[in-house]
Amino acid sequence: FKVTLDTPDGKKSFECPGDSYILDKAEEEGLELPYSCRAGSCSSCAGKVLTGSIDQSDQAFLDDDQGGDGYCLTCVTYPTSDVTIKTHCESEL
């Protein structure tokens, strides 16, 4: 799937298979994104899905309202379609 990250430095796109976490693939592509636990139990890597769909069933931090509003934790989020995610969203939670 094509993943586009809307970062403070501009938009960056890369291919990410449906079985790879978006944060891991972004790092392989040389992108520096915020993270801390890498286990879906904090909010350092939070992003917001602008278009497309994801699977973040491995996360345990965001509540249903935050997930329903489109927020995700990029360290435990898989793409399930082409997706655009705004990064650096921890302060919005």
Curated annotation (Swiss-Prot):
* Family note: Belongs to the 2Fe2S plant-type ferredoxin family.
Gene Ontology CC entries for this record: chloroplast
Q: What is its main location?
A: plastid
Function according to Swiss-Prot or TrEMBL = Ferredoxins are iron-sulfur proteins that transfer electrons in a wide variety of metabolic reactions.
Note on cofactor: Binds 1 [2Fe-2S] cluster.
Q: Where, subcellularly, is it found?
A: Plastid, Chloroplast
Q: Which PROSITE patterns match?
A: 2FE2S_FER_1, 2FE2S_FER_2
Determine if Electron transport is one of this entry's keywords.
yes
Q: Tell me the residue numbers annotated for binding [2Fe-2S] cluster.
A: 37, 42, 45, 75
What keywords are annotated for this sequence in UniProt? 2Fe-2S, Chloroplast, Electron transport, Iron, Iron-sulfur, Metal-binding, Plastid, Transport
Quote the protein name from its UniProt record: Ferredoxin
Instruction: Give a GO molecular function annotation for the protein.
Output: electron transfer activity
Write out the GO biological process terms: electron transport chain
Q: A Pfam family this protein belongs to?
A: Fer2
Q: By its UniProt entry, which InterPro entries does this protein fall under? A: 2Fe-2S_ferredoxin-like_sf, 2Fe-2S_ferredoxin-type, 2Fe2S_fd_BS, Beta-grasp_dom_sf, Fd_pln
Q: Which residues form the 2Fe-2S ferredoxin-type domain?
A: 1-91
Q: Which cofactor does it need?
A: [2Fe-2S] cluster
